Structure formats: structure tokens, C-alpha cells
Curated annotation (Swiss-Prot):
Active-site residues, as the UniProt record annotates them: 20, 38
Family: Belongs to the acylphosphatase family.
Keywords: Hydrolase
Catalytic activity, as annotated: an acyl phosphate + H2O = a carboxylate + phosphate + H(+)
Coiled coil: none
Protein name, UniProt field: Acylphosphatase
Lineage of the organism: Bacteria, Pseudomonadati, Pseudomonadota, Gammaproteobacteria, Alteromonadales
Length: 90
């Protein structure tokens, strides 16, 4: 299994709409670890670690997000893989 790390900045209406909660739920379904946190600028930062195939599924999901959000864009960068035990909302 090819594990990778990925940092995503999600823009749009993504705060105060349950975005981090639904991201945690979706990540756990895909066995992806990491965190989601609100940024002061109104975006959400999502850091993910896991199998490349599962990260790809999460990236596809993040492009749309939950029904309560309106994603206008994502910026993706690969980061070094780190072993973590869960996905949390900060």
C-alpha cells in the first residue's frame, strides 16, 4: 500500500455549516487519518494521511463537500506521510 500525506485548503462557504464534522465522518469511512481545522480567512485546512487511493477519494469528496457547504475551490499539496491514529476536527 502506497501511503501519502496531503494538505488541502478548501475555499467557499465552508465554516459554520458542519464542514469539519462531515469531513471527519467521510475520512473515517475511507480509513484516512489527519485533521480538519478552520482558518481565520474563512477557509478550512484538511491534512490527510493514508493510502493514495483513499486520499484520491477524499479529494473528490472535498471538491463538493457536504450538502450544507458551497465549495468554490481546493488547493492541494503533497506533504510527507506521518502515521496517526485518527481523524479529528480542530
Amino acid at each position: 500500500m502506497d501511503n501519502i500525506g496531503c494538505k488541502v485548503i478548501v475555499s467557499g462557504i465552508v465554516q459554520a455549516v458542519g464542514f469539519r464534522y462531515f469531513t471527519c465522518r467521510e475520512a473515517r469511512l475511507h480509513y484516512v487519518m489527519g485533521h480538519a481545522k478552520n482558518l481565520q480567512c474563512g477557509d478550512v485546512e484538511v491534512v490527510m494521511y493514508g493510502p493514495r487511493e483513499q486520499i484520491a477519494k477524499m479529494l473528490k469528496w472535498l471538491e463538493k463537500g457536504p450538502k450544507t457547504a458551497r465549495v468554490t475551490g481546493i488547493t492541494v499539496s503533497e506533504i510527507p506521510y506521518q502515521k496517526t491514529n485518527d481523524f479529528i476536527a480542530c
